[in-house]
Amino acid sequence: MHNITERDAQVGLSQAWHGLTDVVDEIDVKENVLTKWDVERKPLTYVDVDGNEQETGYGILVGTDDDQIIGKPMTPSYKAISNEKFLDLVSDAMSKLPKAKIESIGSVCNRGKVFVTVSLDGKSNYKVGDREFKDYLNFGNAHDQSSKLWINNTNTCTVCDNTFTYNLNDKSAMVGSAVHRGDIELKLADLSNVVDDFLGTQAEFRQKFNNLLKRKITDKKAQSLFTGFLMRNNPKEGLSTRCLNTVDSLNSLFKRGAGNRGENYADAFSAVTDYYTHNSTRGKGKNRLNQYVSSEFGLGRMNKQSFWTVVNNKDLAERTIERGTKLLSLVNQ
C-alpha cells in the first residue's frame, strides 16, 4: 500500500510505481512540499464539573495549514520533531555533498510519516571498478508515533509507506536514529555528527577500495592470505579440516563471487565480506537471525573489520601471506 491520502503528497524526480508522484526537475530542501505545512502541538483539555477548562498534560498534533489532526494523543514526555527541524538535518547533510540532490520527498498515512531521499552523487548508485554500491541516504520521521526519526543508506528510494517501512526495518543499513524523548535538540545535533562521520567514512572507503582494485594478487597468494588470516591467532596449530574448507569457500568467492574476477585485493576483501555476511555460521548461514547477528554485531563483523585492516596494510598483508604459505606447505608435505 502506498497510503498516500488526500492530505499527503509525494514529489520526485521520476514517477514512482504508484503513479501518484508529482514529477519535478529539481527539489529545493528550503522550499518543498514539507515546508508548506508543519506540525503544532495543541493541549488536550476537558471541562470539569465547575465548567472550567483543565489541561490533561496530553497533547495532539495538528497541521499548521489546516488545523486537522495528525497522529494520536501524545504523552507529556513525547517530543515531536517538526518538519523544519527534520529538513534542517537533511540540509546539513547535503551541505557536505556538492553533488547531492533530493530524489523524493513527501508524507504518507495522513501526514503521519514524512520522508526525504537524497542521492549522494546525483545518482542512485556508484561504481568502484565493476562493483556497484548503494547511494541513497534516506531520512524518515513519524508524527504519528509509529517510528523514531531515522536515517539509512540503501539502494531503495522512499516513495510510499511500503518503502518507508522497508528502509526503516533495514537494520544493517541504518546510519543513525533518535527517539522522540528527552533533549531533542541535542539528539538532532548528535545525529548530524553521526551523518558527518558516515559520509567521511564512505568517502574514505571509496578511495581505499579503489586502491585495492589496483593491487594485484594471484590465486595462490590469495589462498595463502586467507589461510594466514584465519590462523592469525593460532599460527602454531595445524590446519583443521574446517579451516581448509573455509579457505576453499573464500577462494571460490574470490574467483566467482559477485563482481569478483580473482585478480586483486578488492576481490579478496569482497570474498571475505560475502562469506562473513552470508555463510559463516553453522549450516552455512541457513539460520538467518544467527547469521545476521554474527555479521553485524559478532564474530563475523570483527573478522570483516580485521581483514579490511590487513589488506590495507601492505606489510601486514605480506606477513599474513607468508604465514599462510608456511601452514599450507605443511599440509602438502
Residue ranges and their predicted role:
Residues M1-L44, G106, D121-Q333:
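Intrinsically disordered, low-complexity regions enriched in serine/threonine
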Residues L61, V116-V118, F139:
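Generic structural hydrophobic/aromatic packing signal, biased to beta-strands
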Residues D65-D66, R111, H143-Q145:
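Short, solvent-exposed coil/turn segments at beta-strand boundaries
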Residues I102-K123:
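Beta-rich nucleic-acid/ligand-interaction surfaces
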Residues M1-G106:
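N-terminal low-complexity, intrinsically disordered segments
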